[in-house]
Every structure is written in C-alpha cells, then in structure tokens.
Amino acid sequence: MSLPAPLHPSVVHFPIALLATGSAIALVYLLGWRRPALPVIAWAMIFLGWLALFAAILSGLVDRNRAPDDAAVLAVLNPHIAAGFGLLIVYGLLLYERLRNPGVLEARQRRWYLLALLVAGLALVLFEGWSGGRLVYDLGVGVQR
C-alpha cells in the first residue's frame, strides 16, 4: 500500500471544515443562541479539527519539498505555513481554556477572550484556505501541467 503523493490535499479539508464549523457553533452560542447541545458539538468539532490539523501540517511540510523554490510561490507558501502553526496555537489555547474550565462558554469574565480567539481562529482558517487555493490554482503547486 502506498500513500498518495502529494498527501496534503487529501487531509487538509478535515481541519478546515471541523475548525470553521466548530468555531461558528461556539460563536453562535456565545452570542446568545443558548442550546444545551451546542457547546458539546462545538468542543468536539474543535478538538477533532485540532487533531486533524497535525496531519495537515505534517503532510504539508513533507509535500513542501515538492514545491518549486520560486519567489512567487515562497511569498504565498511561507505565510501559509506560519498560519498553520498559528492555528495550532489559537485552537490549542481554546482547548486549554476548555480543559481548565469545562463550562468556560458560560463564564462571562472570559467571553471577550473566547470571542477574540474564535474570530482569530476563523480568520486564520479562511486565510489558510485562501492561500492554499492560491498555491494550487494560481501558482500550480502540486499540479501536473
């Protein structure tokens, strides 16, 4: 059995979908739509997305060796890599808050901090998707022509 080459495109969709949806659900809950199941769903999706992020980053770093060392590619690729590690940090902080206090979404004193982390996480997810799309569709990285 051999792994597909490149592997990164096969795994990258999971953290994007899980982190974006989990963040959106947590934001909806924080902003007032209080349904008992929402925190459970949000934290589960964020945790699974964070785990999937490790696979996406690892496969991306391996596949990076196949990318051309072109200045235009590196101008998009380097921020793309940095944002991936930023996602690990932002969502790691969110999960740490959840670990410290399982009811953190109910804590009024942490609301602005959580909102900031969730919005920053969503912004990074959007940037990751956009920059990854630029690498593939605009610059042809990983595409045989």
Spans of model-derived segments:
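Polytopic transmembrane helical bundles with strong interfacial aromatic enrichment
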Residues: 1-145
